[in-house]
């Protein structure tokens, strides 16, 4: 009797296909309980994606937790003997906080782990199975590969202090070239060192194009060993028709990954559906001398494959369309003028239409006209491929996007302002009025000052005048509004300008179109600057 799986949801079909794939590869199913001792997560919290865990006291008095992670439990219980390689796959739910809903989410995962003796053969098998997993999901896919050993080797060669490494890797991960250079300078690197880090941004593309440049940039044995492993992986997967891409800015968490790292994307989905890498450091906490590599497939992301298609789809005769989230207002007008001047204009009069979607299929461009504060949301969730947004909005939203270019447009700064006669009283918390709650919290936490936040949505300057707050945190451009209301700038702590951002998944499939637009936009901005 044959069972028709076509009636199942995409994630249900995927689970059948992946189970067959993993069992054929010699993996045994690992099943764990829903609860785990909280102490396991408390002692290993640096290996978790978030320290927030759902806990409860069991009937016998033990403090238990709903599992936020599967790999940690497998690493604890596997206990491979010397020379042995254990191969497990799993299909479990984990419970993690959502930055969007500010609640805990139940997340369906399916994945595999190879533990114990992990050499070149096991690494190649794990990455090959990751690629095969993506191929089972029924959409065009990309597997993005990098190596933490290569990144650590470069940081070693440049003499980067341990305390500065996490910040540099975060800027690399976001492809934020402008702030990477600033962070490199803050870490004590000279111009040559900063350029060496910036050069990683260029090590991105098809394996056969990028690997020679990866090898040429090696400075020590650690980098050469990583490059050799990447070469072996490329040879193993050479039949993937360009679906394997190297990207040396892909950096996993320092405390977790120590070797190969990779992420998988499906066309039309806004986030990675697969994440994995080598995590010997975690494994060796439980079994000294052992290694481990594995990955997880995020099945819940596949629910989007059964969602209705948006009304603006590519026609068969069209160029690949770049969907641009453009902020309404002065900034959007400036940006559109620049883009129209370099070949990305639309036949319709941008300023006259009341349409929210304007496009030019011949130029491969489509604009969504949105509220400035919503640009990052449209891009992060994949409704738009790229967008232009102020650094203030981007920071406040903590959007998980690539920050590809500082346009230099709309320059201003984030400031603390107060009445002219204001004196700070360290004996009590500062009352802060702002619409930038997260930015204000982060700034005052960095200087160790307690605050009470008063969230307002407009006319922020009125708050200290009426005694509602002691100070405000707000954007200042010329300072005229502050002066006319008897306020002064106390501290400037964040420069702001408009940034060109991209959805991480869209970048994998439309990077040529994005790079072409970026190159033209940089040239237009440079020409504009020269005219000043």
Per-range role (PLM):
Residues 7-25, 36-37, 69-82, 89-139, ...:
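Positively charged, Gly/Ser-enriched RNA/tRNA-binding surfaces
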Residues 12-33, 329-348:
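Intrinsically disordered, low-complexity, positively charged segments
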Residues 34-64, 414:
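Polyanion/phosphate-binding surface patch
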Residues 52-102, 375, 380-389:
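Glycine-rich, N-terminal phosphate-binding loop and its surrounding beta-alpha-beta segment
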Residues 60-62, 114-120, 506:
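A generic structural motif
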Residues 106-110, 146-153:
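Short, conserved phosphate-binding/catalytic loop or strand-edge motifs used
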Residues 151-242, 477, 486-488, 510-531:
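Long, charged alpha-helical interface segments
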Residues 317-532:
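Domain-level signature for soluble enzymes in the chorismate/prephenate branch of the shikimate pathway
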């Amino acid at each position: 009797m044959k069972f028709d799986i076509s009636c199942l949801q995409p994630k249900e079909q995927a689970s059948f296909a992946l189970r067959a794939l993993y069992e054929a590869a010699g993996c045994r199913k690992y099943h764990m309980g829903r609860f785990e001792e909280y102490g396991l997560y408390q002692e290993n919290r640096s290996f978790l994606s978030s320290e927030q865990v759902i806990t409860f006291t069991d009937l016998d008095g033990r403090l238990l937790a709903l599992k936020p992670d599967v790999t940690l439990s497998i690493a604890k219980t596997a206990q491979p003997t010397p020379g042995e390689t254990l191969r497990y796959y799993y299909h479990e739910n984990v419970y993690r906080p959502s930055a969007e809903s500010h609640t805990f989410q139940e997340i369906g995962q399916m994945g595999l782990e190879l533990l114990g003796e992990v050499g070149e053969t096991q690494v190649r098998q794990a990455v090959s199975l990751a690629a095969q997993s993506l191929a089972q999901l029924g959409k065009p896919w990309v597997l993005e590969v990098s190596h933490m050993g290569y990144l650590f080797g470069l940081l070693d060669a440049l003499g980067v202090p341990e305390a500065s490494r996490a910040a540099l890797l975060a800027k690399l991960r976001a492809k934020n070239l402008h702030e990477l250079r600033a962070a490199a300078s803050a870490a004590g690197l000279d111009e040559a060192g900063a350029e060496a880090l910036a050069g990683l941004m260029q090590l991105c593309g098809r394996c056969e194009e990028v690997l020679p440049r990866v090898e040429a940039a090696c400075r020590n044995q650690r980098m050469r060993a990583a490059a050799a492993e990447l070469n072996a992986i490329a040879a193993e997967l050479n039949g993937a028709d360009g679906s394997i891409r190297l990207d040396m800015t892909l950096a996993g968490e320092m405390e977790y990954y120590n070797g190969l790292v990779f992420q998988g994307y499906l066309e039309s989905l806004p986030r990675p559906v697969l994440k994995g890498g080598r995590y010997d450091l975690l494994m060796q906490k439980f079994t000294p001398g052992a290694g481990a590599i594995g990955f997880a497939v995020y099945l819940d992301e596949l629910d989007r494959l059964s969602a209705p298609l948006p009304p603006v789809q590519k026609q068969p005769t069209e160029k690949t369309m770049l969907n641009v989230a453009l902020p309404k207002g002065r900034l959007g007008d400036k940006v559109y003028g620049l883009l129209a001047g370099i070949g990305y204009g639309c036949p319709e009069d941008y300023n006259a239409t009341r349409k929210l979607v304007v496009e030019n299929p011949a130029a491969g461009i489509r604009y969504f006209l949105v509220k400035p504060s919503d640009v990052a949301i449209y891009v992060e969730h994949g409704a738009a491929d790229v967008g232009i947004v102020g650094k203030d909005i981007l920071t406040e939203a903590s959007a998980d996007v690539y920050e590809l270019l500082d346009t230099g447009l709309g320059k201003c700064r984030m400031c603390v302002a107060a009445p002219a006669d204001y004196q700070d009283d360290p004996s009590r918390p500062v009352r802060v009025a702002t619409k930038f709650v997260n930015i204000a919290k982060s700034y005052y936490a960095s200087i160790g000052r307690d605050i009470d936040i008063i969230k307002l949505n407009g006319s922020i300057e009125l708050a200290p005048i009426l005694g509602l707050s002691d100070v405000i945190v707000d954007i200042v451009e010329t300072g005229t509004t502050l002066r006319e209301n008897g306020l002064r700038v106390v501290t400037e702590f964040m420069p702001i300008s408009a940034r060109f951002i991209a959805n991480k998944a869209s970048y994998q499939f439309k990077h040529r179109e994005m790079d072409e637009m970026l190159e033209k936009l940089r040239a237009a901005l440079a020409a504009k600057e020269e005219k000043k």
